[in-house]
Regions:
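Short loop/turn segments immediately following the C-termini of beta-strands
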Residues: 164, 204-206, 260-262, 303-304, ...
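Beta-strand-rich domains and repeat architectures in extracellular enzymes and scaffolds
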Residues: 132-170, 415
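Short loop/turn segments that connect beta-strands within beta-propeller blades
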Residues: 172-176, 226-231, 269-273, 312-316, ...
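Short, conserved, GDST-rich strand-edge loop motifs in beta-rich repeat architectures
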Residues: 202-218, 397-416
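Beta-rich, blade/repeat-based domains predominating
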Residues: 141-157, 185-207, 238-256, 282-298, ...
Length: 444
């Protein structure tokens, strides 16, 4: 693994930045760093393919793959460029790499690659679409809520689910959803995290929530709620910068929340005071899930558009984790820890899947990746997750697929929200057989 972004490491090592000093403009990705350079090269390769400038397309896609070798979009551009340049063997190798990472593709969308397909590649493509593994359905909720976040009180097993459709934090009593805390119209509840008797909730206004009015100022708050009474104990917001909060994580000493609109990760030190910017704008396209190691000195953040990042909370160093050759780390949403392993919800790669990533002791490298569950009828747009003992509890079917971008139901009888369970000690090892998102839309 190589050291990324020295300037960012210096910023973080010198101390986090106050929110008030940041500009309020739309998200800008720094062109001098990995994500900015990668995006520029990807655009260059795509334009060159369109213009049939094959040598230029090959060069640009090669440079982009040096930065991000598991990018499905660029692997396909590489295959197209090489096919156009008459380098059939190299083009086939790019296509083989793409499929080896478990991704699927519509063959009809890439007619120029038709001569490359053979029985072995067809077999791999078909295998990549097949379901893997199973999970136990432990809750089914028929009412349309669009469940995003989940939190479990470990001792009692009490389940809390966030809802976007009508903006609420719900508690499950005897298998039935009951509102614990309702939000103002147009404001949805996203990530949830429990710490003692406090339920921390990331909230944001958005089109999917009933009553949303784009003419009104955007709302983004983290709420500290008494999990028993549902009363708000404290509110935390950033008055200086428009935000859209998504995932949240209750760390050993600090709280973290991702802002998918601004591309930043914020920290609430000691669970009090004001937000500090841990990862500033320019380095991630759409930060999502967050999780600390057991010691609480390393934070892993998933960027939907570029993979997983390791932040040393003592030194401020940030490095991107390299994907094993048989997976891509793009499109990962929620994260949780089981021992030294990471459990990841990957809903940006189809079919949807739940992964277990075996990490080195220092969390600097991924030694192996396993697909716990992939596809199947009950797994659709999975979202929030939590490990309780040796069980993974997760939102297997969130109902995101049942609503349009404006929150309108797509059917008079939407499917249920499903909470699933996986016994992490009994799952057999599996080989992941894994197109590529830039950001979760319309989620934060």
């Amino acid at each position: 693994m190589r050291r990324l972004w020295g300037r960012l490491s210096a910023v973080l090592a010198a101390g986090v930045m106050a929110c008030a000093v940041l500009p309020v403009s739309a998200q800008t990705v720094d062109p001098d760093f990995d994500l900015g350079r990668f995006r520029a090269l990807r655009i260059e390769a795509a334009r060159a393919v369109q213009a049939k400038e094959w040598d230029k397309a090959v060069a640009a896609s090669d440079e982009a793959l040096i930065i991000m070798p598991s990018s499905g979009a660029v692997l396909l551009l590489s295959a197209q460029a090489r096919a156009g340049a008459g380098k059939a063997a190299e083009a086939k190798a790019s296509l083989r790499d793409y499929l080896a990472r478990g991704m699927v593709v519509s063959k009809s969308s890439y007619p120029q690659l038709s001569p490359l397909w053979d029985a072995k590649l067809d077999q791999q493509l078909m295998a990549n679409s097949e379901p893997i593994g199973t999970f136990k359905s432990v809750q089914r909720h028929a009412a349309l809520s669009v469940a995003e976040g989940l939190a479990i009180e470990a001792k009692s097993g009490k389940t809390y689910l966030s809802a976007l459709s009508r903006g609420a934090v719900n508690i499950v009593n005897n298998g039935v959803l009951n509102p614990l805390h309702s939000l103002p119209e147009g404001v949805g509840a996203y990530g949830l995290a429990l710490r003692g008797d406090d339920l921390w909730v990331a909230t944001s206004s958005g089109a999917v929530t009933k009553g949303y009015d784009p003419a009104k100022p955007a709302v983004a708050e983290v709420l500290q709620i008494d999990r028993l009474s549902g009363q708000v104990k404290a509110r935390f917001t950033d008055e200086a910068t428009p935000r859209r909060f998504g995932d949240i994580f209750a760390g050993k000493t600090d709280l973290y929340v991702s802002d998918g609109q601004k591309g930043e990760v914020l920290r609430l030190s000691n669970y009090s005071g004001g937000f500090e910017v841990l990862i500033p704008e320019g380095y991630m396209g759409s930060p999502q899930g967050l999780v600390e190691n057991e010691a609480g000195n390393v934070l892993i953040v998933s960027d939907y558009s570029s993979g997983l990042y390791r932040i040393n909370l003592d030194s401020g160093d940030m490095d991107r984790l390299e994907a094993p050759a048989n997976i891509t780390l793009l499109g990962i949403d929620g994260l949780a820890r089981h021992g030294n392993d990471l459990i990841a919800v990957q809903n940006g790669i189809k079919p949807d899947r739940i992964l277990r990533l075996r990490l080195s002791a220092d969390w600097k490298t991924i030694s192996r990746a396993e697909t716990l569950v992939r596809g199947g009828e009950g797994l659709r747009e999975p979202t929030g997750l939590q490990v309780v003992g040796n069980k993974l509890i997760f939102i297997a079917r969130s109902q995101w697929s049942d609503v349009g971008a404006d929150g309108t139901p797509l059917s008079v009888t939407p499917g249920p929200a499903i909470v699933g369970e996986i016994d992490l000690e009994r799952i057999p090892k599996s080989v992941p057989r894994f197109s590529e998102p830039d950001a979760r839309q319309p989620r934060p």
